[in-house]
Amino acid sequence: MAKDIKTAAVLGAGSMGAGIAAHMANAGIKVHLLDLPLDEGDNRDGRAQNGIDTQLKRHGFQRPEYAKLVTPGNTEDHLDRLGEVDWIVEAVFEDINVKRDTFAKVDAHRKPGTPVSSNTSTIPLEVLLGEASDEFKRDFSITHFFNPPRVMRLVEYVEGPDTSAEVNEQMHHVLERQMGKVVVDCRDTPGFIANRIGNFWMAVGAKTAFDQGIKPEQADVAFGRPFGVPRTGIFGLFDYVGIQLVPGIWGSLLKALPSSDAYHDYNIVERDEFKTLLDKGFTGRTAESGFYRGREEVYDFAAGDYRPKEKFQVGKDPKELMESGTPEGDYAKEVFSTFIKYCCDTAPEIADTVDQIDIAMKLGYGWKKGPFELADSIGIDYVASLFDDAPSLLTAAKNAGGFYADGKVLGSNGELTDLPNREGVIRVAELVAGAEEIAGNDDATVYKLTEGDYAGFGVFVYKTPMNSNSNAVTELWTHAPEWDLKGLVIANDEERAFSAGADLGTLAKLSGPEGDSEELARTIKQGIDGLHGARVAPYPVVGAVRGVALGGGMELVLHTDASVIHAEARVGFPERNVGLFPAWSGPVRLLERLVDLGVPNPHATAFGVLLNVRPVPAVNVDFWREHDEVIQSPDHVVEGALELVKKLADGYTAPADVELPLTTGTLAYTDGSETDKAIGEALAKVFTGDGTATEDELAQRQVDAATEVLKRQENHDRAVSMATTRKPLNN
């Protein structure tokens, strides 16, 4: 059975190799990072050390201290370390001879059975292995990470015909569960999936723009937001990747693909525009400029110099854009139709199901929807109408009702098939299907599971946008002690948010000099009572936290017995932006934790945390408790929470109300406006005084202070601004 690994080695300390090593360290793996020795000076490990230092500067490590888990070395003096590790990754230069020489050294020094993988993005596995031993072939695979490894969740995995089942299982476990990646199993074809498809899209976008006389900034607007493409667009992405890589990456695919492949129709390597930029050294972010210089200038090939960017506007709907008859619409239609045709024509060669291509484009290139999902959302009949002779896979999708129809996905052979399952990834909608609804309202439902390993346990599911805490939600929580459950997990399928906070509309309506202060006080008290209900329920409550947990959502996390939290979840208290401080006993729970942890000056520390509006990655939070689990995979937080609540249920006793010390010290917010200072003064009233305060006394302090500060016109204006525009008002 696969298990977590403790040690690894990465050979090659460039941007990718050092990035992989850094993210291994994020996952708690001790890493040996090896590169060629420096010839001069005493520090022969300088290249590897430079790789570590670069990752520290680029925030490849989630916490700076994780860099201590990476030991630098070199490939002459330290190959013996390979015999100590559980996994070896090759990330050296994309040269077959260099890689084969590296593999020979690895095979001579590794423990028998140690998995070895290559991070190649261009060389087929069959070519890589060459004359490797049978034992090496059984332990070998390709693990193609995307840069930067901390951020990009996609890993393309290629197994060979001789790769053992044990190695495949182990690699999937480490990549998915331990390192938090989404593994797409690929065939051993040129460019695998993401670069084969993504590079083609970029080439089509560039060549079509040049041929149609579409300006770079015009192209990036046209095939940008309407299609769910990141704001870089196509030309901005070339700058980001580095234009100097075009001859190597795009050129290598041209050499690897047969002349019949449509890739050859979009040979940007030979385009004068790319040659011009390369000749001038305008390579994008690796230089001072590329297609763009800064944010306001773009290269004009006719003039041979940079000019101010022009402003172009298009609508949000891709179909309306493609039918608009405008230059932008005609360009977008040509790019999209060419791209979706290539995806359809290529799918049988590179993928088993179309969702593999969609996942690759979403996680490898940042698209909101993959090309096949996009085709379904635009309308499969319309997409088919773009062709006189539609690709066979597109015709199959039309006949099936879409690439995704009836809860299934189209295989690359044109047949509908079940969506593949990833081990340990639980969809809440499927989990609660058939479960008993024991409580709920329009904004949330509490389910009691009746079958399987989690029978008797409950799931709290929001139904509000971004899982916000409306009055109906907080009222529902007040009844938590009444629910007949073994334990409760707070979970949902909304990847963007555990809970984005309180219902801002209510605050905006009730606050201000003319607002209903009594109703405002009741609303705040109900929030306190609701979260208190979650805390004192006679069963454990566990949060499955991913996306964001902000404001009232983070206060709810603090009221759970424990949570399983994605390391990159953004957590914090932005209440100051809405004219308030966290007032649902978040201050109480945070102070309680800090006191229990023995933090010096806990009131001042809590004060600073509660008024810092900037969310931080959960991995950087220092007040998680013993039972809280911070993991790398957002897709496994639900499973983790269910397992944790089962463990906590045995012999569970609800926590008692607390009595906490107050402080006689000065707590003041001095950096902001008078409005910010007023919020700081209000929060200080909760924490300051002589002796101690009970839970009820602290609750009343919060209600009084929050109601008073929200009477101010300036604070009301902040609440209205956030509720109506989602933008903070710095008044």
Residue ranges and their predicted role:
Residues M1-L488, D493-E495, G505-Y539, A549-L550, ...:
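N-terminal glycine-rich phosphate-binding loop for ADP-containing cofactors
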Residues G543, G547-G553:
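Gly/Ser-rich catalytic serine loop of serine hydrolases
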